[in-house]
């Protein structure tokens, strides 16, 4: 099954070098094992754009936008056996944050892709 991890920090702060090194080490291991298919950090919302449909009309809006309460910081896509394995790997990923950037708070949402 394919899963997406959506990482949302409670407070947007730059990651420490120690955290980035630990995350890259974990990602390298998961890529070599054939589990991690893709991952990345996202640029700030102020650099993005939104395409909307309102009352049947398309519009494109460049950032910056009104601040959202939650801002997605990054994502990862995994191919794993089941939800239990996906959650276990997400727990390990979040433990890396706890160990290498004390005080960091956030969420890693685990979502299965629809379909095969």
Task: Please tell me what each predicted stretch does.
Residues 1-116:
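Conserved, structured core segments of small domains
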